[in-house]
């Protein structure tokens, strides 16, 4: 099964594509969709078009996207919600079922600690997918979203979560830190 993860943002939207087979996670692609400095409709159109292109290029079976959190600044929350909406429209237009997860669910599923830092997310994603370097923060969150969906969507053993994949690599999580 191929999963497309999306980390929505008005300036930068992260994406990550993984293949899941049993307990095995395999990296396919990741990166960002950058919007131009332009009016809001143009930026939202760029996100929609970018997501649509990703679906055509990578042919995912399912998608996962981060739920909007309420920011201190209501204007920022509204803009993020619009960017997320543009991404969801692209996913649905591409015929994908879309799952939504909170940042807490994402961090808990990937790192094993709901208050994990960006750096901890990057490190764990790189280890779980056997990457040679750390992905950028937006791409790491998007890859993490795909991993979270693989876990929550019963593609990985939900009783063991990501523990079997970590154990095979000689790793475990202790106090939010990856140890080996």
From Swiss-Prot:
Needed cofactors: Mg(2+)
Catalytic residue positions: 7, 66, 138
An annotated GO BP: DNA recombination
Signal peptide: none
Compartments, record wording: Cytoplasm
Cross-referenced Pfam families: RuvC (PF02075)
Catalytic activity: Endonucleolytic cleavage at a junction such as a reciprocal single-stranded crossover between two homologous DNA duplexes (Holliday junction)
Cofactor note: Binds 2 Mg(2+) ion per subunit.
Binding site for Mg(2+) 1: 7, 138
Enzyme nomenclature, EC number: 3.1.21.10
EC top class named in words: hydrolase
GO molecular function, one term: DNA binding
GO cellular component, one term: cytoplasm
Subunit note: Homodimer which binds Holliday junction (HJ) DNA. The HJ becomes 2-fold symmetrical on binding to RuvC with unstacked arms; it has a different conformation from HJ DNA in complex with RuvA. In the full resolvosome a probable DNA-RuvA(4)-RuvB(12)-RuvC(2) complex forms which resolves the HJ.
UniProt name for this protein: Crossover junction endodeoxyribonuclease RuvC
High-level lineage: Bacteria, Pseudomonadati, Pseudomonadota, Betaproteobacteria, Burkholderiales
